[in-house]
Every structure is written in C-alpha cells, then in structure tokens.
Amino acid sequence: MEIKLIVLSLALLLDRFIGDPPLLWQRISHPVVLLGKAISWGEKNFNDSSLPPSTLRRNGMWLTVGLVAACIFAGLVIRSILPHAGTAGAIVEVVIVAILLAQKSLADHVQAVAQALRDDGIEGGRKAVSMIVGRNPDRLDEGGVSRAAIESLAENASDGIVAPAFWFLVGGLPGLFAYKLINTADSMIGHLNDRYRDFGRFAAKLDDVANYIPARLTGLLAALATSLGHGREAGRQALSIMCRDARLHRSPNAGWPEAAFAGALGLALAGPRQYGAETVEGPMLNATGKREAEARDIDAALVLFWSTMSLMTGLVIAASLVGLFVG
C-alpha cells in the first residue's frame, strides 16, 4: 500500500502543476477518448431501438462488463510489466495515474467560464460552460451559468480526482482503469432519455456504486478544507448543509460534494435544469443561499476546490511517509 500511496502522491502533484499538455493530446488520443470510442462502438452496434427493453438492458450490461474486464486485464498486464523496467517503470506508473486525474484540466475549464463571463458577458459564459456540462446553456442567465460551473466543479472533484485516486489505492492500475471506464460509460450512455434509458441502465447503476464512497469523501474533505480555511463555524455549516440536503439531489452521489460546496460558499445549487428538450426537476441544495451567482462565486469555488485537493494530497503524502517510516 505504501508504494501506491507514493505513486499517488507524485501523480497528484504532477497533475496539479502540469495537467494534460494540449500539444501531447493533439498528436495522440487521450486514454479516456479511447474508452469513449469503445463505448460508442458498442452503443452503435448493440443499442437497437427495435429491440425490447429487456434485451437492450442485457446488451448494455454485457457491453459494460466486457469493457470493464478488458480494462482490468490491461491494468494487470501493465502492472506485471512495469516492475521489470526499474525506475523507468515507476515513473511510467506515476505518469499513467496523473493522466487519469483531472485537477488542473477541470480547474482550467471552470476558470474559463468565469473569465468568459467577465470578458464576453453572458454569451461567452454560455459557450464556455457548454464545454463542461450537458445541460442546455441557451436558457441560462449569468446566475445559471455560474451555478452550472460550480456544480460541475464540485461533482467532478469527486468523479475526476477523488474517485480515481480512491480506486487506484483499492485496486492499483486495474482498479483505476476499471473506474475510468465505468465513469466514462455513465457520462455517455447513463442517461434517462429514450435512447439510453434501458441500454445505459447498468452502466449508470454501476457508476452509482463506484462513486458511493468517493462522493461522500469529497464532501467531507470540502467541509474540512472550509473549516481549516475559514474557521470551525464555516466548516460546520458546510457539513450541516451536506448532511441535510445531499439526498435531495436526483443523483445518489453528486449531491454530497455539491451540497458541501453550497454550504461552504453560501450558494443555492442544483434545482431544475434543462438537457436539450428535456427538463429535469429537482429541489435546490441550500435553498436559502444566494441564487444569483456570478463570476466571483466561481472564483471562490475554485479556491475551495484547490483547498480540498491540497488537503487530500497532504493526507496522501502524510500516509505515504507514515508507511515508509513505520513499515
């Protein structure tokens, strides 16, 4: 375990300060893009609307299981090869883990929304936020754009960083690869619309299971980071709102980090949202909080995000040092 903690510590630092170099991924496909292509291929070949719902559910289940198994196998193969490469193998493992984390890329995309609102007004904000959320941005005002960016930041703090880190510690590279496949499948086919309701059902449920612990850990880390940065009362407020409102969210997991961010920032988040022609109803988290969010609230959310990531990284580094000296 101490080796995985050291690898994760270095990967978190590498991802934080370097992130995903655009020039690299312009030349080769990012691993998540490759996962997406595999899922897209399976969806095109096995999600036939003429089939009965039970068959679609079965097809979606076997596609997801098959791809997860392939990811686990790939992780096992790479894990068996790397030790024979010595120091180079250790460096490669750190780089692989860093590539599958998303601290800097997530923060950069969210910061772009705040900057677009300042520079180009509502139209710029809508365009920027459309890069990170699936909802229809055309009907969003400045408050809606800002809330959408903050909600995406909170949810993806779990999905994009805490959960991959958690599953790497649990299962090494096979666990990390499997999680990234599950999460990518959920984002692509785990929707409650006519096209994916049956075919993507298994992927969505599996993602709920995979993110159950990480989502709650993310909320707790955000509340603790708030306490460390703004005092115990602010931290208690974030924790209280999270425990009270997290289950109001339509997702069994996203509500935990989103409610923690809502309580920490004094904002009302979530609520009704538009996905294409579909309106998804839902209550607000921290309903008495500020609803007319703006660019400076995105800035505050980014400060909270980085505080949360710093806390997690510090805990991982501390655990790795304890493992080295005690073990």
UniProtKB/Swiss-Prot annotation:
The keyword Transmembrane applies. Coiled coil: none annotated. One of its GO terms (cellular component) is plasma membrane. It comes from the Bacteria. One of its GO terms (biological process) is cobalamin biosynthetic process. Belongs to the CobD/CbiB family. Converts cobyric acid to cobinamide by the addition of aminopropanol on the F carboxylic group. This is Cobalamin biosynthesis protein CobD. It comes from Brucella suis biovar 1 (strain 1330).
